[in-house]
Amino acid sequence: SYVRVCFLGEVSLPKHECLLYSHACSSSSCGVSPVIAYSRLWLKRALRAMNSSYSRGMSEAAKDTGAVLIAAFEGWNDACQAATNAVRHLVKRYESREIRHIRCDDFYDYQVARPMLCHVSGRTNLIWPQTTFYDITLDAGKRIYAQIAPEPNYRWKEYCSQSLAIADELDVNRIITLGSMFSDCPHTRPLPIAVSDGDCQCEGDRSYNGPVGIPTVLDVAAAQQGFAHSSMWVSIPQYLGSDECSAGTIRLLDALGKYIGFIFDTADLKQKAEQWKAQASILVRCNDQLHDYVEHLEHDYDLQQKAEAEASLGAPQAEQLVKEAEAFLRQMGN
């Protein structure tokens, strides 16, 4: 169940890769030995894994080297469409073209992810749910790839395998997944954003236990295949419903831009974000109970920000501030 590849020694193959290897051994194409071709694939992955391990000791500035794939998925991982709208904004704002698709039949329940009917120039068309990959040119010296799709209903492992095979073809070095989730946070403050770097096992990454969506599964699969990987999640106020949240989209794009060393143009989103915030403020003013709730969230948010600022300076009172924040959260829970 392994292939011996040059000086790298033994490279273990997952079960589905063993099946692919067996199939390769029984056929050939383009006059190249399938065993050699498959060994090349695993040599490439092994070298990527070695490079990923080496890069962990390098500076943060090194993270913007190599091809990057940005992935976002509709559904459970996409509160108020903040994550998928980030990808849609990049596709619309910058020069982009569709370069790959993943067939939809094996991955979707059409009673959940239904096809859409549309009429164009007098003709009736059905648009089926599918995964689309884009090549996006940001400027003369920088390009990224993007993946957008409804969250699959079935066969997540196979779906991730196909996604990463395409990333392999595109010579992608890093996978960055985007997500948005409803949370107890006020609309009157910058929306909280969490950036998890697969190269750094931070305490926050180990604190969650519970169900996950396809972005997390893709992160794990990417790590297993030697890709560098990161994830970015923005929190959306749960009391405002499911209308599109441009403020959340901007937060993701700002974090992504900082990470890869590029400033994204979000001018057209900022006006929508201001409208979203103004409408939320009107709603809060018209509901006394909601007004009190938001005030509690603001107090909690400000206390946490103060504690983090003090902790970053190494001040002795930081631990006390953290305890106060935890006590306040327990009081809200009761």
Where are these regions (language model features)?
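Extreme N-terminal basic, low-complexity initiation segments
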Residues: 1-11
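Catalytic cores of processing enzymes, dominated by hydrolases/peptidases
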Residues: 183-263
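N-terminal short beta-loop-beta anion/metal-coordinating cradle
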Residues: 51-151
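A conserved C-terminal secondary-structure "cap"
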Residues: 240-334
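Internal, conserved structured core segments that host functional sites
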Residues: 150-198, 218
